[in-house]
Amino acid sequence: MKIVKIIAIIALVGFVGIQFIPTERNQSDTVPESDFMLVNNVPETIQKKLQVSCYDCHSNNTQYPWYNKIQPVAWFLEDHIKEGKAELNFNEWDSLSSRRKASKLRSIIKQIENGEMPLDSYTLIHKEAAFSEEEAKEVINFMTQLKDNL
């Protein structure tokens, strides 16, 4: 019984201790001129859906949830955001070549069609981020139009 108490105390001290390890924040006060929304004159309804469903992980400005202040959850989110931005950063859209843009648009279309994005782990907590069938069609049609006009 004594060993269990010691292990519990060590675990509690460790958990409290890791709360003081900072994480990198993905927040910016400005929207760059190279942003996907600005460059492509995206309709307002699609802008809103992309903001809610995509931009937290695929831009330079994440709207952090309350649970981001708890370790080790914050580390998981930080890694997830870094991976998302490495794959696609909407804020850097205009810096991509036409060929790369077409590739990214094909990928976006495919992932929305297959229900791969937004991730289930994200929509589990952020219900508003999930695409309805109508929203998915609208976004896919817009992305297809963009790709065809490159």
Predicted features, each with a name:
Residues 1-39, 145-150:
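Post-cleavage N-terminal segment of exported redox proteins
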Residues 26-41, 90-94, 120-125:
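Sequence context of c-type cytochrome heme-c attachment sites
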Residues 38-42, 74-89:
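Short microdomains enriched in Cys/His and/or Lys/Arg
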Residues 42-55, 77:
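Sequence/structural segment immediately N-terminal to covalent heme-attachment motifs in c-type
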Residues 50-61, 117, 139:
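The canonical Cys-X-X-Cys-His
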Residues 64-78:
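Acidic helix-start/capping segments at beta-turn-to-alpha-helix junctions
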Residues 80-110, 127-136:
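Electron-transfer interface patches adjacent to heme c in soluble/periplasmic c-type cytochromes
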Residues 114-116, 123, 127-150:
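C-terminal capping alpha-helices of c-type cytochrome domains
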